[in-house]
Amino acid sequence: MKRKILSLAAMVLTTITGNAQSQAFKSLTVEAYEQAIADTTVIRLDVRTSEEFVAGHIDRAINIDVLNPDFEQRATTTLPLSKTIAINCRSGKRSKRAAQILVRHGYRVIELDSGYLGWVAAGKKIMR
């Protein structure tokens, strides 16, 4: 009986742990992010304000401000679930927030850990 209970508990724990891991997103360095977005099927999402975006952004990024109350609705109706979403913000905080929201909806997400500031500091190409 004890073995059955322990076995059942182990299966439940494995299932819970597996689900938690599949619900995660990856935070990438500038170099790893640059490699990831070289894949043209990856959608680049900038979650800063429109003013920040216009001042400069990563090439081919689309802009949906995570601080807008309608972010979740706009993102889930705009972004296809079949694509990996590469998120950036200014420094990395807002992109993590956006990543958590999108992961809850089943998206595969990567985010730029150091944000747009890290991208610029590394001398990477920007668009204005």
Language model features by range: what are they?
Residues 44-46:
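Structural scaffold elements adjacent to functional motifs in cytosolic proteins
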Residues 88:
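Short, surface-exposed ligand- or partner-binding patches at beta-edge/loop junctions that are enriched
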Residues 2-7, 16-42, 51-84, 93-128:
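Rhodanese-like catalytic fold shared by cysteine-dependent sulfurtransferases
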Residues 12-13:
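Repetitive helical segments and hydrophobic/amphipathic motifs
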